[in-house]
A protein has these predicted regions:
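Short Gly/Pro-enriched turn/cap motifs at secondary-structure boundaries
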Residues: 1-4, 30, 154-157
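Macromolecular interaction modules
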Residues: 2-9, 17, 28, 52-56, ...
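Conserved N-terminal beta-strand and adjoining loop/helix that marks the start
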Residues: 4-24, 33, 38-52
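Short, well-ordered beta-strand micro-motif
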Residues: 14-16, 26-28, 167-169
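Short, solvent-exposed loop/turn segments at secondary-structure junctions
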Residues: 31-33, 46-47, 152-153, 172-173
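The catalytic Nudix box helix
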Residues: 41-43, 49-141
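Glycine- and acidic-residue-rich phosphate-binding/metal-coordinating active-site segment common to enzymes
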Residues: 111-112, 118-184
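Conserved small/polar residues in nucleotide/adenosyl-binding loops
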Residues: 186-194
């Protein structure tokens, strides 16, 4: 296997507790490849900005050395967690972050419009996650995201991903909403029906 051709990626299973157990968030990809019209979990490839040393300084509870160790890497592990946060915010509007003073984000109230605007600008590459964190005095909540699997796309595929899978609890006071670009539909479902 030629590891040089593998594209590093992160995928997140977001769960929430319900009376009968738990639900997991699924998304339907848009008609754009890869994975057009498929139901998947939010995620995508690691961007260069996910590797930026500046964003690593805003990661609460985890540094690159610890993250890399958890993934069995020599370095660069934290970029997978950052990609999880960024992809979730871009694709479904969920932001794994808190105010620097420890206060939870409430993206259902008076700040919803402001964060919707940040999200639109992030998707269109007018701003990056680091800029949002600095502007709003945020820390990314890395301890809410845990790795649990590692898959590599089979050799038969033309585009191959080296994907780390993570699990995270959906934060309170945030409602998932598809972006209309990469994702055309979001759905919370029981894992047995996923």
């Amino acid at each position: 296997m030629n590891k040089l051709s593998l594209i590093p990626a992160a995928t997140v299973l977001m769960i929430r507790d319900i009376d009968d157990g738990m639900e997991v968030l699924m998304v339907k990809r848009s008609k754009k490849p890869p994975f057009e019209n498929l139901f998947v979990f939010p995620g995508g490839k690691i961007d260069e900005a996910d590797k930026d040393i500046n964003i690593s300084n805003l990661c609460d509870g985890l540094n690159d050395q610890e993250a890399s160790k958890k993934l069995g890497l020599s370095h660069g592990g934290l970029s997978y967690w950052v990609a999880c946060v960024r992809e979730c915010f871009e694709e479904v509007g969920i932001l794994f972050a808190k105010k620097s003073n420890g206060e939870d984000l409430d993206l259902t109230g008076f700040e919803k419009e402001k964060y919707d605007n940040y999200r639109d600008r992030l998707i269109s590459n007018e701003i990056n996650l680091y800029d949002i964190c600095i502007e709003e005095d945020l820390k990314l909540t890395m301890l809410n995201i845990a790795p649990f699997s590692h898959w590599i796309t089979p050799n038969i595929e033309t585009k191959r991903f080296d994907t780390r899978f993570f699990i995270a609890h959906l934060p309170n006071n945030q409602i998932e909403k598809h972006d209309g670009t990469a994702v055309s539909y979001t759905h919370l479902t029981l894992p047995t029906k996923a």
